[in-house]
Amino acid sequence: INYVSKDVDGLHDFYVNILKMDSIAPQQFPRTDATSDSGYDGKIKFATEGSMQMHLAERDLDVAAKNGRHINPVERGHIAFRTDDIEGFKRHLRDHDIPFADYGTAFAAEWYQIFFHDPEGNIIEVHQQVA
């Protein structure tokens, strides 16, 4: 689950101290270096209760425009699912006329990510490990 905030440290402290989740070292999630026209360089912290991860990211309303995409995954947060066949899943979305934003590895060096909306406008990420 990805939540966004203007106060990532405060949000992380809430999940770690109040809900007693464990902090995950950011080194476990290598990031792609952001450039002036690609990627994301906002603050991110991570927490887990053992089977689910929280990715707590700094809100950035310009990410979609900067990356030339129509969906901004750090505008209001999203849920994520893992696949072993990202190309097959993209075909599946196309077959159902569901538009998606293909960010590739722009955000995470080891994860290929796409984002799309459910019927209510909630953002969904599907990703595949690439390294």
Give the residues covered by each predicted segment.
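Core segments of cupin and vicinal oxygen chelate
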Residues: N2-M52
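A short acidic-to-branched-hydrophobic micro-motif
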Residues: M54-E58
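Vicinal oxygen chelate
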Residues: I1-K6, G42-G50, K66-A131
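Hydrophobic side chains in well-ordered alpha-helices
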Residues: L11-F14, F89-L93
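Short beta->alpha connector loops
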Residues: L61-D62, D85, A106-F107
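A short, acidic/glycine-rich surface segment
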Residues: P30-T35, D62-N67, D102
